[in-house]
């Protein structure tokens, strides 16, 4: 019996507590939003299969929410990850400043050459914005990675961000692109509905 997919990619979301990692995963995998999720304890993941470049890609998206409060994500979390999404909250400047620490954690624990993506969540809360898009775009360019702003609540750019990372992994595994340096960072300029003020505070 033929497999229902062509490739299996393990993705990992990391970032400070409260930036919305769990909400993003639920939105992507189940197209649902609920701001009363119970914070993740231990390792949890969701699965969704997407079509990219004519291939069926099974994405296994791992959630580290509930662990980052211990200030460490062990090597076990990073093992086998082909793509890592670094998440911050656009209304929380500290969560953005800590992205540098998460970058360091990736360097120390993840496989060399793992694909990375910077993601600013809660862009539906524009009135409470503390991190400007230009700041994040600059950081992404410094690291040679893509950048998106998303809203797990409105679903803005969520599919686009995950699909972009999966496409980069696919192209890299196919040998048609070498290294992150040849990949121009991407900023999605879509705006979110400023009237939406609810937030997902977990993960």
From Swiss-Prot:
Binding site for Mg(2+): 22, 40, 63
Disordered: annotated span: 173-203
Activity control note: Regulated by guanine nucleotide exchange factors (GEFs) including DENND1C, which promote the exchange of bound GDP for free GTP. Regulated by GTPase activating proteins (GAPs) which increase the GTP hydrolysis activity. Inhibited by GDP dissociation inhibitors (GDIs). Activated in response to insulin.
Residues bearing the modification Phosphoserine: 178
Claim: Metal-binding is one of the keywords in the record: yes
GO cellular component: bicellular tight junction; cell junction; cytoplasmic vesicle; cytosol; endocytic vesicle; endosome; extracellular exosome; insulin-responsive compartment
Pro-peptide positions on chain: 201-203
S-geranylgeranyl cysteine lipid attachment residues: 200
Lipidated sites in chain ((Microbial infection) N6-stearoyl lysine): 194-195, 199
Residues noted as binding GTP in the record, renumbered to the chain: 17-18, 20-23, 40, 66, 121-122, 124, 152-153
Membrane topology: Lipid-anchor
Residues with the Cysteine methyl ester modification: 200
Cellular localisation: Cell membrane; Cytoplasmic vesicle membrane; Cell junction, Tight junction; Golgi apparatus, trans-Golgi network membrane
One GO biological process term: endosomal transport
Short sequence motif Switch 2: positions: 63-80
Keyword Hydrolase: yes
Homology family: Belongs to the small GTPase superfamily. Rab family.
UniProt function note: The small GTPases Rab are key regulators of intracellular membrane trafficking, from the formation of transport vesicles to their fusion with membranes. Rabs cycle between an inactive GDP-bound form and an active GTP-bound form that is able to recruit to membranes different sets of downstream effectors directly responsible for vesicle formation, movement, tethering and fusion. RAB13 is involved in endocytic recycling and regulates the transport to the plasma membrane of transmembrane proteins like the tight junction protein OCLN/occludin.
Protein name as it appears in the record: Ras-related protein Rab-13
């Amino acid at each position: 019996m033929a497999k229902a997919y062509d490739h299996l990619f393990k993705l990992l979301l990391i970032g400070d507590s409260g930036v919305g990692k769990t909400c993003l995963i639920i939105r992507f995998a189940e197209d649902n939003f609920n701001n009363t999720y119970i914070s993740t304890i231990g390792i949890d993941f969701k699965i969704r299969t997407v079509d990219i470049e004519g291939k069926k890609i099974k994405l296994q998206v791992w959630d580290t929410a509930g662990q980052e409060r211990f200030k460490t994500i062990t090597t076990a979390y990073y093992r086998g990850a082909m793509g890592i999404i670094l998440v911050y909250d656009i209304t929380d400047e500290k969560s953005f400043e800590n992205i540098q620490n998460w970058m360091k954690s990736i360097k120390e624990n993840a496989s060399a050459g793992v694909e990375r993506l910077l993601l600013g969540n809660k862009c539906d809360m524009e009135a409470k914005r503390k991190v400007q898009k230009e700041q994040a775009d600059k950081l992404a360019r410094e690291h040679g990675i893509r950048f998106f702003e998303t809203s797990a609540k409105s679903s803005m750019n969520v599919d686009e961000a995950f699909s972009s990372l999966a496409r980069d992994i696919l192209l890299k595994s196919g040998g048609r692109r070498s290294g992150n340096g040849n990949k121009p960072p991407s900023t999605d300029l879509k705006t979110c509905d400023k009237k939406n003020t609810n937030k997902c505070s977990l993960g």
